[in-house]
Regions:
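Terminal low-complexity segments of carbohydrate-biosynthetic enzymes
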Residues: 1-21, 25-29, 34-37, 41, ...
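Active-site-proximal specificity loops/subdomain of glycosyltransferases
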Residues: 2, 9-76, 89-100
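Alpha-helix N-cap/helix-initiation motif
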Residues: 54-61, 219-227
Length: 345
């Protein structure tokens, strides 16, 4: 990115911050190093995988976002990938305020126990509950995640991108739904917001599932299913603790990713397939694991739930693939760091 593009991006960021009366804080890699070094000296536990090796090698992409989630003091966190921009209203042509819509989703109740066929009954412009919806369930529960969607380039895995290289998402549906309790979903980290206090410990986006060497070599910041894994953890924990997860608006516009544009869509997808193939295969067994996972009554907050999932991963999935033993170690390191930071707040 040249200086002109950086200046333009900074102007867009500042305008967004002013619109929502927010402050900005720029954190460099050196700032992150100092913070994690200080945190390590305070910790009484020693892990096989350190937080520094997890988040700083390299300090880009999902590692940066995960570090931000860890140290943020905000109640709500809104996160977008660098290749998305605000989508436009198809009627008026005006840019949609994705931040405001995410916050509206999080601040309104969710209905995970009984599906309302008229979309989100707690949305400001909703017509409410349909006939037959139990009155005892209409109060809803706290929403801990708002999962947005995208227009433009679909968030495909590599095999699908190979067979559908020219496919584009063009249909805009102005709706929000609560994902029912017991149902899992594939989270996309490109457009998501969450309640940091209630579900934040689940939002580690860098584990290296099926590609554990990338954790240490610095050749990749994550694998293609790391954000999906975070979503599976978050949904299971939300169900266990009695919270809700919403999906739908806001939309963002997703442009061509560099890996898909340098040598053409198919060539980029073929290159991605080399790193995605194993994680995608493992996902076929990971999803049933989460579908049958049951947390104990002793797990009463997201930190405890995440640590308990880490132990289950180590006990039940490491026989499936050696990378899961390291995934469990990463999760344990993250859970302890989260507790250490937030116990001091």
């Amino acid at each position: 990115m040249d200086e002109e593009e950086q200046d333009e991006q900074q102007k867009v960021l500042q305008n967004l911050l002013l619109l929502h009366e927010l402050n900005s804080e720029v954190v460099t890699k050196r700032d992150a190093e100092k913070f994690l070094e200080a945190l390590a000296t305070k910790s009484s536990k020693r892990h096989s995988i350190t937080l520094s090796s997890l988040l700083l090698n390299p300090f880009v992409g999902s590692a940066c976002r995960s570090f931000g989630f860890l140290v943020s003091k905000a109640r709500y966190v809104v996160s977008f990938l660098e290749d998305v921009v605000p989508a436009k209203d198809l009627g008026s042509g005006e840019l949609l305020d994705a931040v405001e819509q995410h916050l509206a989703n999080l601040r309104s109740k969710a209905t995970p126990y009984y599906f309302n066929t008229l979309y989100d009954p707690h949305r400001a412009d909703s017509v409410g509950f349909v006939r037959g919806y139990p009155f005892s369930l209409r109060l809803g529960v706290t929403t801990v995640m708002s999962h947005g969607l995208s227009l433009g380039l679909p968030d495909y895995d590599a095999p699908t991108a190979i067979v559908k290289p020219h496919e584009r998402t063009q249909r805009y549906v102005d709706a929000v739904v609560t994902i029912p309790k017991g149902s899992l979903f594939p989270l996309s980290g490109s457009n998501v917001a969450f309640d940091r206090r209630l579900i934040g410990p689940c939002m580690l986006l860098r584990l290296g599932i099926g590609g554990q060497d990338s954790l240490f070599s610095g050749s990749s910041s994550s694998t293609s299913v790391d954000d999906v894994w975070a979503g599976l953890c978050a949904k299971v924990v939300a169900d266990h603790l009695g919270f809700g997860v919403k999906t739908g608006v806001p939309y963002v516009w997703r442009g061509p990713d560099s890996s898909f544009s340098s040598n053409g869509a198919v060539a980029g997808a073929l290159a991605s397939l080399k790193t995605e193939f194993k994680p995608l295969l493992l996902l076929e067994d990971v999803v049933p694991f989460f579908q049958t996972l049951r947390l104990s009554k002793n797990a009463t907050n997201a930190e405890d739930c995440y640590a308990e999932i880490a132990r289950m991963v180590k006990g039940k999935l490491r026989g499936l693939d050696p990378s899961f033993e390291r995934v469990a170690a990463v999760m344990e390191t993250w859970a302890d760091a989260w507790k250490a930071i937030n116990s001091a707040v």
